[in-house]
Curated annotation (Swiss-Prot):
Family: Belongs to the ATPase gamma chain family.
HAMAP family (alphabetical): ATP_synth_gamma_bact
Gene: atpG
Record lineage: Bacteria, Pseudomonadati, Pseudomonadota, Alphaproteobacteria, Hyphomicrobiales
Name assigned to this protein: ATP synthase gamma chain
Primary role: Produces ATP from ADP in the presence of a proton gradient across the membrane. The gamma chain is believed to be important in regulating ATPase activity and the flow of protons through the CF(0) complex.
Amino acid sequence: MPSLKDLRNRIASVKATQKITKAMQMVAAAKLRRAQEAAEAARPYSQRMGAVLANIAQNVSGEDAPALMVGTGKDDVHLLVVCTAKRGLCGGFNSQIARLARDHARKLLAEGKTVKIITVGKKGADILRREFSALLHDHVDLREVKQLAFVHADQIGHKIIKLFEEGAFDVCTLFYSEFKSVISQVSTAQQLIPASADNEAEMETAGDAIYEYEPDPAAILSTLIPRNISVQIFRALLENVAGEMGAKMSAMDNATRNAGDMINKLSITYNRQRQAQITKELIEIISGAEAL
């Protein structure tokens, strides 16, 4: 049984930890609002761009279609771009994204495909390195980035397009977590290359609208598809930040509550042990007085 001094030290230690988790919860809550607003603001733009691409794609076929839209005609080599948080302490947020990417990689490898992985965020790299260290092609470290901007997504997009033009892969899939609410983030896989317009809402919007394009649709697609890749990556990064802050706020709230429960239990144990010690000392004093 621990001594009273040990119990006091443990209570003080848990209280100090509770202050830290409470502060982290408040910081995450403050960041969550801004991150959520940024993610929600990016959705209409990315969705509308997808709708425009779907509409233009209906007017382009054959040799006029850009390679980024039709692909290489093969699906032998797959590039997985896995976006996770740059830090931990956010529950199962990172592991859920990594699990989705890992399952997809295992499936492709079982089918005899070649898999290459680009990780965005330190935690995803740490998780996937345990099983797929030989498949890790590149890593994008955003730990020094204080304010996420489109230029960061654009750099990743240019890197992916350059690899595609060099013939490094046939299909590119983006993995991230779509923000739903503070307690709900959905791990998502989205095909970037070949550019896919399989979203029903985008197809319906594209079918309802009538556009006239100048210059020709193929020339527009050649410019718009690379832009769309960067836009989709930027949206994924913004969704990830919002999801990370939501998961971190929830995790730190649970940690703060658990610390409070532990403090209560330790305090009860401390008071009982202290009471027992006082009672024992009183009995010894009374026994000594009676002996005299």
